[in-house]
């Protein structure tokens, strides 16, 4: 049996979870897209074609691709998993007691494929075949959603992240994404691929309100050698990082967490939108945000499950020290000032490394890809004119569950 383990950002990628969000994207409109954290509506047909190409590119590199909807459908075959998900998704507090019971009964009549599609892609009031004694139903527009679509499930990196020998099921920052975590909780507990293996769940797998302790996988880079690099961003808080660090140290899966502060704006919502690891000493960086002389924080274990937190004056030096390197090769976003800003917006720095020196990147970022090529990095180009409008690149759209260390 293959081992669930992610030991780096650059070691051979072996297995990964992706999501092809057809139903959810078809429910995006100009009216609701901003509430669902998209800047615009996407062409569904083109986006799915681009995603299929992404899947094919990974499989051509001998990466096993698991699709989230398939995993959820297979998880729902377990009766306890189905009951647990519906109890958490369709609560009396969200819908009122009578209406919630009738929605659950309606959904239990669906086969597992249909139910997975609804949970991921949404359900409108007009699709309900019954009228409940419910003020909520009576006051709602027929085309309002009973169950909101989850188009951001496209970005499987964020909802859970495998860090060395375990997983963090992340408490998400935005209301539009919070339901995503329950799908991964169910999959990791009941799907036979995971239920037959033992691994620590660092964070996010309890029935509790995590308050301000949010964390998203786009901010988490497993840089190797027992180190984890995390961005403090609009989505990931210091409280989230410290709670994650405590569990990493308790389970002896990591020896240091390095944290850096990012601006809180949409263009760099996660660390991996401005920085990714491409080869042993090679990083892609957007220089307007990531500077080698910026401060960072080193978090290490300190007896009796306490944390030692020390501010460091030089990020580059801390990174080299963690990776046991004498120097770093920093490749900055390509083009002039205007071109670099445009390409960063379209995820030029958000690449998925397949193995050292080989990355998947959007083909549209020609200036940055040219710099990668000149630096000896092999770029496997994929289309991203539609997918990129969701504000995520190849790394954002992938959740590695098996990758070699360095």
Swiss-Prot record:
Please give the pathway this protein is involved in: Amino-acid degradation; L-arginine degradation via ADI pathway; carbamoyl phosphate from L-arginine: step 1/2
GO BP annotation list: arginine catabolic process to ornithine; arginine deiminase pathway
Is Cell membrane set as a keyword in this record? no
Q: Which reaction does it catalyse?
A: L-arginine + H2O = L-citrulline + NH4(+)
Location in the cell: Cytoplasm
**Gene Ontology molecular function, alphabetical:** arginine deiminase activity
Q: Which domain of life is it from?
A: Bacteria
State the active site: 396
Q: Which InterPro entries match?
A: Arg_deiminase
Query: What's an example GO cellular component term for this entry?
Result: cytoplasm
Which key words are in the record?
Arginine metabolism, Cytoplasm, Hydrolase
- Supply the EC number(s): 3.5.3.6
One Pfam annotation reads ADI
Does the record bear Cytoplasm in its keywords?
A: yes
* NCBIfam families per the UniProt record, alphabetical: arcA, PRK01388.1
PANTHER family (alphabetical): ARGININE DEIMINASE
- Record-stated family: Belongs to the arginine deiminase family.
The protein's name in its UniProt record: Arginine deiminase
The organism of origin for this protein: Aliivibrio salmonicida (strain LFI1238)
Gene name of the record: arcA
């Amino acid at each position: 049996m293959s081992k669930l383990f992610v030991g780096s950002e650059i070691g051979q990628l072996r297995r990964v979870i992706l999501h092809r969000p057809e139903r959810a994207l078809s429910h995006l409109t100009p009216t609701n897209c901003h509430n669902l954290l998209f800047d615009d509506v996407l062409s569904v047909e083109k986006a799915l074609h681009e995603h299929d190409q992404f899947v094919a590119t990974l499989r051509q590199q001998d990466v096993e691709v698991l699709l989230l909807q398939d995993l959820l459908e297979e998880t729902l075959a377990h009766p306890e998993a189905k009951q647990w998900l519906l109890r958490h998704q369709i609560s009396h507090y969200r819908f009122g007691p009578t209406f919630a019971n009738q929605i659950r009964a309606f959904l239990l009549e669906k086969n597992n494929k249909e139910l997975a599609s609804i949970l991921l892609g949404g359900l409108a009031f007009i699709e309900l075949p019954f009228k409940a004694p419910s003020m909520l139903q009576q006051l709602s527009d027929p085309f309002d959603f009973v169950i909101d679509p989850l188009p951001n499930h496209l970005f499987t990196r964020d909802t859970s992240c495998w860090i060395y020998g375990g997983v963090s099921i992340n408490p998400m920052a935005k209301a539009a994404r919070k339901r995503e975590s329950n799908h991964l909780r169910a999959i990791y507990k009941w799907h036979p691929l995971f239920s037959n293996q033992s691994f620590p769940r660092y964070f996010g797998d309890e029935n509790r309100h995590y308050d301000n302790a949010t964390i998203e996988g786009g901010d988490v880079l497993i840089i190797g050698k027992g180190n984890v690099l995390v961005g403090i961003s609009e989505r990931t808080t210091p409280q989230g990082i410290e709670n994650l660090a405590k569990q990493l140290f308790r389970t002896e899966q990591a020896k240091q967490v390095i944290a850096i502060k990012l601006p809180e704006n949409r263009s760099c919502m996660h660390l991996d939108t401005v920085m990714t690891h491409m080869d042993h000493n090679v990083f892609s960086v957007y220089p307007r945000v990531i500077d080698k002389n910026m401060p960072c924080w080193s978090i290490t274990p300190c007896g009796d499950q306490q944390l030692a937190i020390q501010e460091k004056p030089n990020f580059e030096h801390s990174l080299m020290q963690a990776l046991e390197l004498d120097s770093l090769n920093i490749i900055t976003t390509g083009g002039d000032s205007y071109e670099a800003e445009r390409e960063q917006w379209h995820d030029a720095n958000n690449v998925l490394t397949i193995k050292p020196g080989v990355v998947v990147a959007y083909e549209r970022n020609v200036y940055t890809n040219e710099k990668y090529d000149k630096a000896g990095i092999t770029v496997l180009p994929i289309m991203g004119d539609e997918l990129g409008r969701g504000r995520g690149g190849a790394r954002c759209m992938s959740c590695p569950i098996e990758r070699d260390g360095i």
